[in-house]
Amino acid sequence: APFIFLTNGELIYFWDYQNDDARIVNSFFSRRDLERLVHMRAERKPLATVPIPDTYLRQGETRTLRPYQKGAMQALDRTVELGKRRFLIELPTGCGKTDLIALYLKRLVQAGQAERILFLVDRDQLAKQAIEAIQDLLPNYSSYWLKPGIVRQEKQVTVCLLQTMIGRYQEFTSGYFDVVVMDECHRSIYGSWQTALSHFDALHIGLTATPAIYIERNTFQFYHCKDDTPDYSYPIQEAFKEGFLVPYKFATGITELVSEGANVDEEHYDPAEFERKWT
């Protein structure tokens, strides 16, 4: 048997003894999980042998991979090959984090490093954007949005709100997913949210647009970042300098709501409804 589970009745260790050290996991893997790992091992090859594309199709048009997107992929390649299992990527808003990660997930699958992927977000609008991007960029990979009340499906890519996964993560074994992507991860590594993330024994990739100096240490600790430094960072000043973003200008003003207030017609406030309507 290529895998060993060790337990003292409280902790469970998973040991892929031919490739890695034993590590703590939250639950035993299923037979299907282990069969998938054996299959992936037979297909595995170095990420360096999987070319990073110069161009890709997005919404029917050919786009050129930007230098910093290529740099992020190369940084991930190096850390994956070194055996690191958690990664933090910092890219400013508007610099194509979703495109980058979808293209990188494709390379992980091609290298035999992943078959099942979980893409977590914390807002409905972000989930909508993620599933649209994944289905556009990865049309050959089955995917779906796991919403409350929807039965779990056996597809390659699962997009889900973290708020939903908190109540459903125990439906999955710890070995069910090979990669867990968390968008805007600096907001999502506290309390029960971190419990849901930590349940999965997977490669964890955190995405954030927040500059490193404003990220709390909890995020760096979760993603095993050395010296509180992301695995790859592209500062917004560089994006301005290189012409990938337009410099912003501050505009000040006072809205009628701020100056005059508002009358509340109903006492009931539904945060979920507010989220759907305004985000």
PLM region spans:
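ATP-dependent helicase/translocase motor core
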Residues: 1-116, 125, 129-140, 154-157, ...
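Conserved nucleotide-binding/hydrolysis micro-motifs of P-loop NTPases
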Residues: 10-13, 124-126, 163-166, 186-187, ...
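Conserved SAM-binding loop
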Residues: 65, 119, 182
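Conserved helicase motor
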Residues: 121-125, 144-152, 161-167
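SF2 helicase catalytic motif II
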Residues: 172-206, 211
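Interdomain helical connector at the RecA1-RecA2 junction of SF1/SF2 helicase-like NTPases
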Residues: 217-279
